[in-house]
UniProtKB/Swiss-Prot annotation:
Positions carrying Phosphothreonine: 170
NCBIfam families given in the database record: proS_fam_I
Protein name: Putative proline--tRNA ligase YHR020W
Pfam families per record: HGTP_anticodon, ProRS-C_1, tRNA-synt_2b
Gene source species: Saccharomyces cerevisiae (strain ATCC 204508 / S288c) (Baker's yeast)
Region of interest called Disordered, as start-end residue ranges on this chain: 631-650
GO CC annotation, single: aminoacyl-tRNA synthetase multienzyme complex
Amino acid sequence: MPVSEAFAKLCVNEKPPAESAVAVKSLVFKPKTPKSATPVPIVVVALQSTTTPSALIANATSSKDPRLARDDLVKQAFQSESARAFILGDLANATSNFHLLIDHELGTVDGDTILQLNDSTYMKKSDMMKFLNNFEDSQKVVDFSQEVSKETATEGKKQQKKQQPSKAGTAAAAAAAALEDAKLIGITVDKALDFPGWYQQILTKGEMLDYYDVSGCYILRPPSYAIWENIQKWFDDKIKAIGVQNAYFPMFVSSRVLEKEKDHVEGFAPEVAWVTRAGSSELEEPIAIRPTSETVMYPYYAKWVQSYRDLPLKLNQWNSVVRWEFKHPQPFLRTREFLWQEGHTAHLTAKDAEEEVLQILDFYAGVYEELLAVPVVKGRKTEKEKFAGGDFTTTCEGYIPQTGRGIQGATSHHLGQNFSKMFNLSVENPLGSDHPKIFAYQNSWGLSTRVIGVMVMIHSDNKGLVIPPRVSQFQSVVIPVGITKKTSEEQRKHIHETARSVESRLKKVGIRAFGDYNDNYTPGWKFSQYELKGIPIRIELGPKDIEKNQVVVVRRNDSKKYVVSFDELEARIPEILEEMQGDLFKKAKELFDTHRVIVNEWSGFVPALNKKNVILAPWCGVMECEEDIKESSAKKDDGEEFEEDDKAPSMGAKSLCIPFDQPVLNEGQKCIKCERIAVNYCMFGRSY
């Protein structure tokens, strides 16, 4: 359904009583730009009672002097009749990029509250947020109450010009400015009230990523890329230990090769990006950018494998892939380009191949549980959900407590002989030439940067990121404290030298540590900054600590404090980091275990789903029944169906996996949805 039609469908048909509706304004601003540049309009959605200062709008969008837009810009950008007639539904008609600023105070309004968008348009708050999430790449939640008056800022600039402050005055002014800025630096959205807005802020303010000017593509900043590097190192060591080698294949695929395996390509066809031109010339044959590499690699496997002695062939590549066609990009979870590893192996026997599939799945579970402190359920995908062209797919499934949705973590596929027959990857039978040749048994398996998004969603809080110590770019920050105006230069130097010594000692035992020795910022500001960035522990060191030969250690996840003597630094700090790692996993596992429930009767299925649970239900194994479960669980009690986008989080419960760890299935147990006999318990849930 087009987004414009979706907006109309979400509107309330009958006008509610005036006293029950909350007024909301939608304003379009135009930033000041050079005459040669095209202005990017700024749309502000706020409570009618909220003041929206232009200075804060400029700050939130990194623009200059935004002013209310005139009719010509609004007509051009959103095809609206005029600026006065602009309504949120016009966002669906946008002809170019725009900024969307959402008032933080809207998060305090209950989801069922009716909002008045203009004289004749009304909508539930939850439905308005659902509509605005169509433009997630453009949106940002802003706390307009934090604005500093323009007059004060202007007067401050005048005073700076009039007098040259002393060195001490400069430091004090810098510290004061930093504390004032901290209001805007911190997270301004409650995780429980506006999860999408919180997720966006925590990634950008925590410096995990930045938005790129191509929709659905993101810049991985050093903290997030370091997490990916730590995962790479751990997983690379694991797969090399079982004989896998790294290689690299080109990112381009000819249409002829890509279309050779139709069943496989069909699942990716809408998402394939094509190169059709080189400069001003049309290419004779369009070239695809790989969505995955089976069809890229397997012709060469067939070329290189000349004898059964060449098997197994086990290659992995660390690369990026492009999958283009979807409407709801989400950083890390669903992006148009993403980093991953993809392993492709060929074996002489099905037994060897199937054993490797499960071994790799254990490695993937290790990435989540041992590195990221994220619990997962291992299982097998249904026939409907398995990898196109494969015999069977195994998976690690996670759970996002805030939304109650499952999320696919990583998959390991057994392809059988389907691809080897297609690409003629065959060898002579070891039993002799009088036996038929053998087509290789193949596997493919992949893990992507999605893991980072899952980790952030599960562990982080309203203070900022919470990053497990084993994958964090830095595991500890050393912060000198207790330095005041009365502290002599000699004392200050001694505190810093002692702090640097602590930092150095930690590095020597493999702790990823750094120190912040900038005296222009207060310790309190630094504490907030490193909590926002998710540094696992901070180590405080002041004059009194030095006298006692100790440091104070504070954990990021729960602010638990430890006093550690200098003599125990090398032994105790690693222990504290491991304790934190374990506590993060324990907390996440308790939540997942609590919200993974067994339901045997259909009458309890949707109520359990609506309590943010994933469900273990007896199932017959029939695909039509699986589809019926998803369709039926997507309906409201009044029979109205939720609108769904295939790539958006599903409202109906889809099959997540058939867990390897099965509850006891009683003899004669019926399927939860039909009258057939159940063959196993399947895990169902709303999902990403």
